[in-house]
Amino acid sequence: LLDGYDFVLISFALPAIKEAFSLTLVQSASLISAAFISRWIGGLVLGAIGDRYGRKPAMVLSIFMFAFGSIACALAPNFWILFILRLVIGFAMAGEYSASAAYVIESWPKHMRNKASGFLLSGYAFGVIAAAQVDKYFVTWVDSVHPGWGWRALFLTGIVPIVVAIYMRRTLPEAADWSEAKEKGDGEKNDMLAVLFGGQRKILNYIVVVIAFVGLMVIFT
């Protein structure tokens, strides 16, 4: 849901941001692509946190990061601050999706996990619908009261996921499969960061990571 919401949110806000900061076409497009630059490392790091400490902590952390990034975007004074915050949001979204996918699939009964996966993917559509409605009604109203502030108000709606994260932290149990694997001592063996950066090829892997990140920056910006 957050993925779909953010993708449409930045698309709706972009024309107003372009005008507010006098951006070029390339700069405007980079605000969308920024979230894709940091996604791969977000999935890696937050996925490793989910493997080591649990799916629920990884989900809660990623949602808080998304909310922080979104709220901070509303207060961004210039293009570069906004670009960096978009990197934070992309990092968080990848972690949120990987953690929530693992949580849902590991928590549902085995005979229903295909349905669980489909249910999870449908959240993207609901996020798109939610963003469209917020832009249609809330942003229009804010712009009518304070012209030019509508796009900032759109990002401020990022405070809503904080409520969800607090609810999840207090009420949701840990994924059953992860808890079982942890009891058996399998959690550490499956830690993605340890697999990639703790073996004999760790230096090569570090180099590949840097090259990949620089390559994505060049391509998308």
Outline where the language-model segments fall.
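Transmembrane-helix signature of 12-pass secondary carriers
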Residues: 1-221
